[in-house]
């Protein structure tokens, strides 16, 4: 009987530990592979997600590079505004409702980036490198390229 309890305890602990190690956000690369980029909902989520990662990047570089931090926060706000515009057009939401929803979602995604960035920092002393966060940044940078 003690062996069964011990085995159960070990299994439960390993499940908990694996859950605690999991990233809070799914990689944008994986997300976009599973979604249709032509759909408004996918575009809206992508804009919110990119807004969150630029806000996160702004906070990371704030002390070392105030100019880049300011640029990142401007990009973040522009992406969030574009998501609000799409929500008003595609989902027929009122402007105030769309703004509130977009800001709430960005805060959630931003918090996830903070938590995952801290985990990555503990692992390899980088907020971005070696994690999905750097891949997300590359994807999001393509949205802001000037043609």
Residue map of PLM features:
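Classical Sec-dependent N-terminal signal peptides that target proteins to the secretory pathway
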Residues: 1-23
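Short N-terminal segments immediately surrounding and downstream of signal-peptide cleavage
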Residues: 21-41
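Stable alpha-helical elements in mature extracytoplasmic
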Residues: 24, 43-50, 133-136
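Short N-proximal segments of mature Sec-exported proteins
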Residues: 36-92
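Compact alpha-helical subdomains of small soluble proteins
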Residues: 76-147
């Amino acid at each position: 009987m003690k062996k069964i309890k011990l085995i159960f305890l070990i299994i439960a602990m390993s499940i908990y530990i694996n859950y605690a190690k999991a990233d809070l956000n799914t990689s944008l690369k994986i997300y976009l592979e599973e979604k249709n980029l032509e759909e408004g909902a996918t575009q809206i989520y992508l804009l919110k997600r990119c807004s969150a990662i630029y806000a996160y990047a702004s906070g990371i570089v704030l002390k070392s590079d105030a100019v880049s931090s300011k640029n990142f926060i401007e990009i973040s706000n522009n992406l969030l505004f574009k998501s609000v515009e799409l929500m008003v057009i595609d989902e027929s939401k009122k402007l105030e409702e769309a703004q509130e929803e977009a800001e709430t979602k960005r805060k959630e995604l931003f918090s996830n980036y903070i938590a995952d960035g801290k985990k990555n920092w503990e692992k390899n002393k980088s907020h971005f490198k070696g994690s999905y966060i750097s891949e997300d940044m590359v994807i999001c940078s393509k949205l802001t390229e000037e043609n």
